[in-house]
Amino acid sequence: MNPNQKIITIGSVSLTIATICFLMQIAILVTTVTLHFKQYECDSPANNQVMPCEPIIIERNITEIVYLTNTTIEKEICPKLVEYRNWSKPQCKITGFAPFSKDNSIRLSAGGDIWVTREPYVSCDPGKCYQFALGQGTTLDNKHSNDTIHDRTPHRTLLMNELGVPFHLGTRQVCIAWSSSSCHDGKAWLHVCVTGYDKNATASFIYDGRLVDSIGSWSQNILRTQESECVCINGTCTVVMTDGSASGRADTKILFIEEGKIVHTSPLSGSAQHVEECSCYPRYPGVRCICRDNWKGSNRPVVDINVKDYSIDSSYVCSGLVGDTPRNNDRSSSSYCRNPNNEKGTHGVKGWAFDDGNDVWMGRTISEDSRSGYETFKVIGGWSTPNSKLQINRQVIVDSDNRSGYSGIFSVEGKSCINRCFYVELIRGREQETRVWWTSNSIVVFCGTSGTYGTGSWPDGADINLMPI
């Protein structure tokens, strides 16, 4: 090869290499520009349209680092669209209930700063469960805990902690309340908080940490609400509220709330005579509540709420094994689905039940006359057959020698079905335990299971003689 040919060959190779390098630089530039603009766009899986990221609620700010030769590009991954909960999955098929959580608040109060509380409940957002309670504005080892048996004071606040975390001094006080309900619509928490004078109380509606709406007492006689979770379906949350006599005719209303704003109010209709402290659960496309009749019945009222047209119906649980306390013994108790049974109807306790086809799962105190012990069972035909009494799958949650209290339901959405869970309030202190001057509680929580399970008893467990007076 002569010198001229060598020069031409070297030049051709150099030109080829230069061209390749030029094309690579163009590719890097195009990639950089594309990724820069795509960080502001998300593909919508519904219709393949491009949607801006900014209006979407970002739960986690994730950054992916992409390396191309010597160029570093930061690409923001668009978060999953947060949607309202619709609770359209079927209810889980269960054989009974398994232990889930216990906070041991009273035992811990013997040596730590734990809030004095009552009226606890549990509710979950799409990713985590929380426990709530109405605090008394004091810790247990504090002279302000004297005489905390009283239900309604201006110092009571709604407390919120992750489930299983006792209400310590760092606990968040969500709102001022001596009666409350809370629920998560898929986007944010709604808290319904009642406080004020007995004859002129106020219910505040707090959504996503902001006060959005309020309503005053309509019967001037202790406006009150559920003391357990409300339910939201497709952005509409329902809460049952009562104002009026605790031992006679009262005025119950069902409020429909969207992002904290009251959009409709429906009066109670149907055959229920007295409704308080409802334990509600989603029953798509509506909401179903099992409540307390504090006037005429030891059988529990049922309130069915139509979220679409705001209509209400009510009746009573058909099971002849009734759920309230006090009540007749199981041989003489009765319920015929439509009306209160007029059996030891005065007084009562918050409780729960839920339908399972024609059957009903329910919980109640073991004692027929006091808030002692706690049991659950299934009544065959208990949802559809008047005075049905065939009981199966009975479990003892708290033995009859130990105190219980309020109980309520909450729902947890799984991958394929909606599970029902319940909590039991374990009251300690006054009135029964007069060595101390305070009244407070801990909780135990169980959830439905399709598996097998054993036996036990899960009382509060604190030795009252070791507790601060």
Swiss-Prot record:
Its EC number is 3.2.1.18. It is a single-pass type II membrane protein. Its main location: virion. GO terms for cellular component: host cell plasma membrane; membrane; virion membrane. Inhibited by the neuraminidase inhibitors zanamivir (Relenza) and oseltamivir (Tamiflu). These drugs interfere with the release of progeny virus from infected cells and are effective against all influenza strains. Resistance to neuraminidase inhibitors is quite rare. Coiled coil: none annotated. Keywords: Calcium, Disulfide bond, Glycoprotein, Glycosidase, Host cell membrane, Host membrane, Hydrolase, Membrane, Metal-binding, Signal-anchor, Transmembrane, Transmembrane helix, Virion. It is found in: Virion membrane; Host apical cell membrane. The keyword Transmembrane applies. The keyword Metal-binding applies. Residues 91-469 are annotated as: Head of neuraminidase. Residues 36-88 are annotated as: Hypervariable stalk region. Residues 1-9 are intravirion. The active site is at D151 (proton donor/acceptor), Y406 (nucleophile). N-glycosylated. Intact N-terminus is essential for virion morphogenesis. Possesses two apical sorting signals, one in the ectodomain, which is likely to be a glycan, and the other in the transmembrane domain. The transmembrane domain also plays a role in lipid raft association. Belongs to the glycosyl hydrolase 34 family. The influenza A genome consist of 8 RNA segments. Genetic variation of hemagglutinin and/or neuraminidase genes results in the emergence of new influenza strains. The mechanism of variation can be the result of point mutations or the result of genetic reassortment between segments of two different strains. Catalyzes the removal of terminal sialic acid residues from viral and cellular glycoconjugates. Cleaves off the terminal sialic acids on the glycosylated HA during virus budding to facilitate virus release. Additionally helps virus spread through the circulation by further removing sialic acids from the cell surface. These cleavages prevent self-aggregation and ensure the efficient spread of the progeny virus from cell to cell. Otherwise, infection would be limited to one round of replication. Homotetramer. This is Neuraminidase. It comes from Influenza A virus (strain A/Memphis/110/1976 H3N2).
